[in-house]
Amino acid sequence: KKVTTKKPAAHPPHVTTAITELKERNGSSLNAIKKYIETNFDVEMDRQLIKIKKALKSGVEKGKLVQTKGTGASGSFKLNVQAAKAQAAEKAKKEKEKAKLQAQREKAKAKAAAKKEKQQKATAAKKAKAAPKKKPAKKAVEKKEKKKTPKKATAATKKATPKTVT
């Protein structure tokens, strides 16, 4: 089975933006939130009212919102400042960890590149050392050829001497 991840909503979070923009000290009421969403977003309130109520209830359950008055979806709502600060702190920690990981990866890449360069230099040095060794070997081959020619002459002289004796 394929694991599917939930896509984030394409629209902005209407309820939280409404509560933050209304800036009421004792919290924003459901009616005030509805009016703000109707005026600022292109939304039909008849269809979206149920979703807004559900968003308010789930926000209170999750701790993102605090209900200052009333019960359920009716009453007044404020953003939970403590939860927002905690989330901001968690995000900051995650960003720091990501930055550390990226720094470690970059260091590892730099070390790997340095090792490759050292290896390339070492192999180039070995090749340079190996090349002079080959040159003397060629000279030795030439010397061997020179030695062969006198041997032929001595062999010819040996053959010539027995002929004269008999």
Curated annotation (Swiss-Prot):
SMART domains given in the database record: H15
Chain segments carrying region Disordered: 90-166
Localization annotation: Nucleus; Chromosome
Annotated H15 domain residues: 6-81
Gene Ontology molecular functions: double-stranded DNA binding; nucleosomal DNA binding; structural constituent of chromatin
GO BP term, pick one: negative regulation of DNA recombination
Domain of life: Eukaryota
Gene3D superfamilies in alphabetical order: Winged helix-like DNA-binding domain superfamily/Winged helix DNA-binding domain
Feature: compositional bias, Low complexity: 152-166
Basic and acidic residues composition-biased segments: 90-120
Key words of the record: Chromosome, DNA-binding, Nucleus
Comp. bias (Basic residues): 124-138
Database matches in Pfam families: Linker_histone
Main location: nucleus
Gene Ontology cellular-component annotations: nucleosome; nucleus
InterPro entries reported for this sequence: H1/H5 (IPR005819), Histone_H1/H5_H15 (IPR005818), WH-like_DNA-bd_sf (IPR036388), WH_DNA-bd_sf (IPR036390)
Family: Belongs to the histone H1/H5 family.
Function: Histones H1 are necessary for the condensation of nucleosome chains into higher-order structures.
Protein name: Histone H1.1, embryonic
Source organism of the structure: Parechinus angulosus (Angulate sea urchin)
